[in-house]
Amino acid sequence: MTPRHLLAAGDLSRDDAIAILDDADRFAQALVGREVKKLPTLRGRTVVTMFYENSTRTRVSFEVAGKWMSADLINVSASGSSVSKGESLRDTALTLRAAGADALIIRHPASGAARLFADWTAGQSDGGPSVINAGDGTHEHPTQALLDALTIRQRLGGIEGRRVVIVGDILHSRVARSNVTLLHTLGAEVVLVAPPTLLPVGVADWPVTVSHDLDAELPAADAVLMLRVQAERMNGGFFPSVREYSTLYGLSDRRQAMLGGHAVVLHPGPMLRGMEIASSVADSSQSAVLQQVSNGVHIRMAVLFHVLVGLESAGEEGAA
């Protein structure tokens, strides 16, 4: 992990990732029993969120994380900024740097946008603001991978040696890419299940096993991560019909019964109930969907701490 940014899951060494997971747990514990959920950890720091794509879970959890750590939080949307008047992404980045922001959290539809932000705002004596990638096109979503890993660790007691099956639209999924990288770093075995049309070129070079048969992979799965079909990123027919896709790749009640009793079901959201996952499965005791949301806040607290304060234990800071 670079000292000031989190741009991709590959930025994290195994030790870095475990430190963030551990600190997320510590922050969660530090908040237990507090009537007012406020820690002084980032008091005096200015954090700017910039979301050029719609978001509920990621945006809200970053905002809650910043507020709970006492940061001064500023939200910038494309429609409410000079971007709507034609300002370039580079000029926006330089403006926020000049304004003195300590951290920039960016989501953008273009792959690589977060790294460009980091490059454009660097190079001066103070090093520029920290940049956190909240999702860039189909490229990366590192904090989602971290919260998924935390959820798996909490549910299963560990990640190393666990078999994680990722199902659905791998081609358009930044969540899948970040999860594959991070889970491999943490020692998990990753299986991708998708129709051939929803697998990216070059997937044979990824550290994964590829399958087209969901029924065959479920009995040995420790965790199943269901992905939404991202129709907004498609301009052609990737599968014959929603009904056929759901029949072949949806997590139904019948398929849930194939899972071991210990297995956990995850979904990064938003869920298309009745397509990739049945409502009964999403609301079952094996589902960790809401636990993922809660963990998202604590993971993003840990990430903000690590990029703004440093790669060290958050225990004393969190308990202050």
Swiss-Prot record:
Carbamoyl phosphate binds at residues 57-58, 107, 141, 144, 269-270. Pathway: Pyrimidine metabolism; UMP biosynthesis via de novo pathway; (S)-dihydroorotate from bicarbonate: step 2/3. It is an enzyme of class 2 (transferase). Its EC number is 2.1.3.2. L-aspartate binds at residues 85, 174, 228. It catalyses: carbamoyl phosphate + L-aspartate = N-carbamoyl-L-aspartate + phosphate + H(+). Catalyzes the condensation of carbamoyl phosphate and aspartate to form carbamoyl aspartate and inorganic phosphate, the committed step in the de novo pyrimidine nucleotide biosynthesis pathway. This is Aspartate carbamoyltransferase catalytic subunit. It comes from Mycobacterium ulcerans (strain Agy99). The gene is pyrB.
